[in-house]
From Swiss-Prot:
Gene3D superfamilies: 2.60.40.2020
UniProt-recorded name of the protein: Amoebiasin-1
Motif FG loop: chain residues: 85-93
Site feature location: Important for the redox regulation of cysteine protease inhibitory activity possibly by regulating oligomeric state: C39, C58, C60
Effect on the protein of changing C39S: Increases inhibitory activity towards model target papain
Cell compartments where the protein resides: Cytoplasm
Main location per the UniProt record: cytoplasm
Purpose of the protein: Cysteine protease inhibitor. Inhibits cysteine proteases CP1, CP2 and CP5. May protect the cytosol against cysteine proteases released by damaged intracellular vesicles.
Family: Belongs to the protease inhibitor I42 family.
UniProt motif (DE loop) ranges: 51-61
Length: 102
């Protein structure tokens, strides 16, 4: 089961070596993208997948698929920020997930 924005500021438990996927909506055509601000005790990959849209339509959004893997036992944490890389702002949206790795 994938995690979504509904899981923001929650804690999950996974086994060492187990993968979990976080799916967050975004639209990089606006200049904003989900970036990993910090990641402790976990490995991660981020991939953007655009939503299907009619030919010739620009500016469609999509979903960011962030895969995390428990690499060390103990408490891990990932913080993602939805921002324009060239203009960080204190009001940028964040997604934080604590992960207990067993």
């Amino acid at each position: 089961m994938s995690l979504t924005e509904d899981n923001n500021n929650t804690t999950i438990t996974i086994a060492k070596g187990e993968n979990k996927e976080i799916i967050l909506h975004g639209n990089p055509t606006t200049g904003y993208s989900w970036v990993v601000d910090s990641c402790e005790g976990l490995s991660n990959t981020v991939e953007y997948v655009a939503d299907q849209h009619a030919p010739g339509i620009c500016g469609c959004g999509g979903k960011y698929h962030i895969k995390i893997t428990g690499t060390q036992t103990g408490e891990g944490k990932i913080v993602l920020v939805y921002r324009r890389p060239w203009a960080p702002n204190a009001n940028d949206r964040t997604f934080t997930l604590k992960v207990n790795v067993q």
